[in-house]
Amino acid sequence: MKLKIGISPCPNDTFIFHALLKNLIDMGTFEFETTFADVQSLNEGAQAGDFDIVKISYGNLWNVQDRYGLLYSGGAMGYGCGPLLLSTKSNSLDPDIPVGVPGKNTTANALLRFWATGESVTYETEYAVFDKLYHDLLNADRIQSLVIHENRFTYEQDGLHLICDLGEYWEKKTEAPIPLGGIVIRR
């Protein structure tokens, strides 16, 4: 039986699926067709039912829970690892300049909405692939943006300004770990 798997190229996903994808464990009659994509594309693929097993944003789980069940392993939750809202200009959000967001159904976008609602902040969004957003800031093609992953450790060196650590904001308001993403399987 061939199963369609969708994961991102991030180290978490490739580590979790490494043994399976490299045939290091006996999977019997199961074969895998793997798609590597950014998380928004994976979220959309899950909504369309394109995959048998797929990594999604927890912010998208409610959109697919009728077709997919959440696996008990492989999820990403934690402290101190949420998305950052950064700017090339200042430490405050300019409501007249769109915020670059790595996808409509991403946890990063859900955390941005959570912060904006809690702080009564208004903003406009522009969606782009997550790995393009940071480069756009560095190249001055974008003024303010959400960034995820490793860039949280380098933004100050790169001359960018922190508007809000959305993960830290979530942790303070909820006293819960940041729900980033999980792996779901077709029901």
For the regions a protein language model found, what residue spans apply to each?
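Bilobed "Venus flytrap"/periplasmic-binding protein-like clamshell domains
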Residues: 2-22, 81-143, 148-150
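Hydrophobic/proline-rich hinge and linker segments of small-molecule sensing/allosteric domains
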Residues: 70-92, 171-187
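Pocket-lining segment of extracytoplasmic ligand-binding domains
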Residues: 126-187
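Conserved beta-strand segments of alpha/beta enzyme cores
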Residues: 31-33, 69, 121-124, 161-162
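Short coil/turn connectors at secondary-structure junctions
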Residues: 30, 65-68, 93-97, 140-142, ...
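Short loop/helix-cap segments at secondary-structure boundaries that form the rim of catalytic
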Residues: 63-65, 112, 154-158
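Short, well-ordered coil/turn elements that cap or connect secondary structure elements
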Residues: 27-29, 65, 80, 94, ...
